Amino acid sequence: MEAVIKAFLTGYPGKTSKKDSKEKPLATSKKDPEKTPLLPTRVNYILIIGVLVLCEVTGVRADVHLLEQPGNLWITWANRTGQTDFCLSTQSATSPFQTCLIGIPSPISEGDFKGYVSDNCTTLGTDRLVSSADFTGGPDNSTTLTYRKVSCLLLKLNVSMWDEPHELQLLGSQSLPNITNIAQISGITGGCVGFRPQGVPWYLGWSRQEATRFLLRHPSFSKSTEPFTVVTADRHNLFMGSEYCGAYGYRFWNMYNCSQVGRQYRCGNARSPRPGLPEIQCTRRGGKWVNQSQEINESEPFSFTVNCTASSLGNASGCCGKAGTILPGKWVDSTQGSFTKPKALPPAIFLICGDRAWQGIPSRPVGGPCYLGKLTMLAPKHTDILKVLVNSSRTGIRRKRSTSHLDDTCSDEVQLWGPTARIFASILAPGVARAQALREIERLACWSVKQANLTTSFLGDLLDDVTSIRHAVLQNRAAIDFLLLAHGHGCEDVAGMCCFNLSDHSESIQKKFQLMKEHVNKIGVDSDPIGSWLRGLFGGIGEWAVHLLKGLLLGLVVILLLVVCLPCLLQIVCGNIRKMINNSISYHTEYKKLQKACGQPESRIV
């Protein structure tokens, strides 16, 4: 122990023995500063004591070596995000978490947020899509868009995170759908929300740099000394407006309650009048203007007629129907108490903002637009496609015949006849030749099935070995690249680091392997031809119905046979009876003739 302390204090290790450990330290030369003992002086003692006191006052603990070390990086990331499919991007060596994922909107239910919110969202309010509530006797067109539920759930999040959620760079995200059918609105329509401090004149067209510059130049708007997290997309011009958040394709009629003040017009609760007629303000943006007290005749999304009247209208009032409006969203106040710390989202649910995503809500977010959704691969896996096909509609499925596979006990010894045997058998016994041919075909089918089963089993074992080796290579390569990046070595330091080509024919191999297995199953024995015919005739009927129809068909065949054969049987029986009677009568006549010829009386005949 003393040797270790000595090596630590002197700055260089050395071999020491028990005898050397008892001796005093060797005197070092002042000319060699590297071998000068690092023994603390009086000034160093004062500095060490001051640092310890400062750490005790500020609450900084010195036992950081007792913190639990993190486990596997990718397993930790998958457990925290609920996402198991991801890939590393080698386009930038300094961004190892840049993924090959895209964001997709997903229906949000309160059951998914159980345990993550403090209360339920019971009263969400409604949105009107056809006309505002100012009209007297207007059409009832109220609905609840998704942004109300999203904003309510975000404000009620109560599970805080220790650190800020990791930002994921996405390839992009899917836009929200437009409303093309007012009777069928999906559960993801209108789910965009934005974040801003209360009262800040925010604009969705701002980039990340513009938003950051505004917050730095106007600190009074933020009303907080803590920094904000800008969640606007990097390529914000691709993820904004109706192209990203969706739009309402029909006209929305709104009441313009305007009064003329000199040569200007004041509309609604405007602070100051503006120049220009309200009609021009409406038609300049593609709207349709109707003066007050006139009728509005609309045919889409459904036909309705309503008067452009309301209470307490000004002398320049009217109705404006604008088309192609962006679906309404909501600005969430990012200075509220629920956003002062990063909040956790349920697994597999992400805050998606264009080409950026978080598995949680960063502290004091600003910007947008964003929605809650999930992540998926740009090119889905073969298993994902199979799941979609299985869960899709099952209409138009062809019914297979009730053939049974050849078992392992079938005979695979194929013994073909020679030319001489075939010629004599075909001339002398054609039936025997046909029976022999059918038997050999059956044995040949059995041999083919067994050979194909052995081949597929062999290829399956090889495929498992190749897959395990591939996984091991990819894991080792990811670990090596990440360790090099963690130590500051990029693509320019290590040759071939960012160019790692590993051929992937697993999908093609899996398809061919599956085709081989399906091809083997095509050889079978039709054990129930009548049942197969009935299933093909009547479609998807159950087995009990097949057995019932087979019984009825058998009874019908028996009845038909009786109807056809019974007259013949009756005719044969009647003929035999008639023949017996005729024979009996003929015998009796001959007997009488013989009796008269012999002159014997009839009474003496016994």
From Swiss-Prot:
Transmembrane segments: 553-573
Record site feature (Cleavage), residues: 401-402
Residues with attached carbohydrate: 79, 120, 141, 158, 178, 257, 291, 297, 307, 315, 391, 453, 501
Gene name tied to this protein: env
Lipidation residue positions, type S-palmitoyl cysteine: 565, 568
Source organism, top-level taxon: Viruses
UniProt-annotated stretches for the region Fusion peptide: 418-438
Listed PANTHER family: ENDOGENOUS RETROVIRUS GROUP FC1 ENV POLYPROTEIN-RELATED (PTHR10424:SF73), VIRAL ENVELOPE PROTEIN (PTHR10424)
Name of the protein: Envelope glycoprotein gp95
Keyword Lipoprotein: yes
Family recorded in the similarity comment: Belongs to the Alpharetroviruses envelope glycoprotein family.
One family name in Pfam for this protein: TLV_coat
InterPro entries the record matches: RSV_p95_env (IPR005166), TLV/ENV_coat_polyprotein (IPR018154)
Region of interest (Immunosuppression), ranges: 474-490
Keyword terms, alphabetized: Cleavage on pair of basic residues, Coiled coil, Disulfide bond, Fusion of virus membrane with host cell membrane, Fusion of virus membrane with host membrane, Glycoprotein, Host cell membrane, Host membrane, Host-virus interaction, Lipoprotein, Membrane, Palmitate, Signal, Transmembrane, Transmembrane helix, Viral attachment to host cell, Viral attachment to host entry receptor, Viral envelope protein, Viral penetration into host cytoplasm, Virion, Virus entry into host cell
Ranges in a coiled coil: 435-485, 503-533
Disulfide topology: 87-499, 121-152, 192-245, 258-267, 353-370, 410-446, 491-498
Single GO biological process annotation from the record: entry receptor-mediated virion attachment to host cell
Extracellular compartment spans: 63-552
Gene Ontology annotations for the cellular component aspect, listed alphabetically: host cell plasma membrane; membrane; viral envelope; virion membrane
Record's signal peptide: 1-62
Membrane topology, Cytoplasmic segments: 574-606
Region of interest: Binding to host receptor: 185-226, 261-288
